[in-house]
């Protein structure tokens, strides 16, 4: 694969609308690193060509938060709740059960969000890439507001003990109920920030890096999460989840020509991307 990549990816040439900008050997990884840029979309790509049977793909986006609503953390969860091409409720869970993946995850950092996958089977890699790329570029969040409510936050009414099973829906029972916030990320961050060291870490970052993205809790502060609206959520996705703001990584013993053609034809040259 390294010899084939060297013949295909010559600096100064193009391949499937990718301009090959640089090539360097990385002895520590026993690999050759190729830096490419997709001409039409502006997407950047790093390909580490090596003999590792594990084939990996990742797409990341620059996502520096402007507040502590956790919008990028909620987006990370939400885009993996179905997409145009894969309209299932939990494609992430389905992939864990059905694919031959050796690694499958999504992570929100203080300034970026990354979606990595790995497998030893090349066809499985393209299946995983297809699901992840459609998830980030064509998620179901635009047609299903309930995804935002489920993964981000929503109101929930706790009825008095015994009232829930009565089924009369009486206004008296409703008035006696307690309104509270609920949501996957909301509850996750309540747990994370129940650790005093996490709270201290946030306070230190806010003091050291005021007026920067690092002053905010990228995962979301439960006190700030309910300030996020569905419209702000969609606008944030539209502004950040596009190829020009992305960095793609490919790694391992794979067919670079096929991989670049797949990325170009299926996603990067498509209007939706």
Question: What do the PLM-derived regions correspond to, one by one?
Answer:
Residues 39-40, 50-51, 62-64, 120-121:
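Secondary-structure transition/turn motif
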Residues 2-16, 64, 78-273:
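Charge-rich, well-structured scaffold segments of protease-associated domains
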Residues 53-57:
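Short, conserved catalytic-motif segment at the N-terminal edge
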Residues 46-48, 58-60, 116:
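Short, conserved beta-strand segments within well-ordered enzyme catalytic domains
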Residues 69-81:
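Active-site recognition of the HExxH zinc-binding catalytic motif
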Residues 7-52:
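N- or domain-start disorder-to-order transition segments that initiate the globular core
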């Amino acid at each position: 694969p390294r010899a084939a990549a060297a013949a295909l990816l010559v600096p100064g040439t193009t391949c499937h609308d990718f301009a090959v900008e640089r090539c360097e050997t990385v002895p520590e990884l026993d690999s050759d690193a190729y830096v490419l840029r997709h001409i039409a979309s502006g997407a950047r790509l790093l390909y580490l060509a090596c003999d590792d049977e594990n084939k990996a793909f990742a797409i990341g986006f620059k996502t520096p938060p402007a507040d502590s609503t956790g919008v990028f953390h909620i987006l990370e969860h939400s885009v993996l709740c179905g997409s145009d091409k894969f309209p299932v409720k939990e494609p992430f869970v389905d992939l864990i059960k059905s694919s031959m993946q050796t690694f499958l995850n999504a992570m929100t950092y203080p300034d970026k969000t990354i979606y990595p996958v790995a497998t030893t089977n090349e066809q499985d890699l393209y299946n995983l890439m297809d699901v992840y790329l459609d998830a980030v570029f064509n998620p179901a969040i635009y047609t299903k507001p309930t995804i935002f409510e489920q993964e981000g936050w929503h109101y929930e009414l706790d009825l008095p003990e015994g009232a829930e099973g009565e089924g009369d829906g009486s206004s008296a029972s409703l008035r006696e109920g307690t309104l509270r916030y609920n949501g996957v990320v909301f509850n996750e961050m309540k747990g994370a920030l129940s650790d005093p060291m996490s709270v201290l870490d946030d306070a230190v970052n806010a003091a050291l890096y005021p007026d920067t993205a690092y002053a905010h809790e990228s995962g979301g502060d439960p006190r700030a999460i309910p300030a996020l609206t569905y419209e702000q959520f969609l606008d944030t996705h539209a502004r950040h989840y596009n190829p020009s703001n992305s960095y793609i990584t490919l790694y391992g013993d794979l067919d670079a020509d096929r991989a670049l053609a797949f990325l170009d034809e299926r996603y990067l040259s498509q209007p939706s991307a």
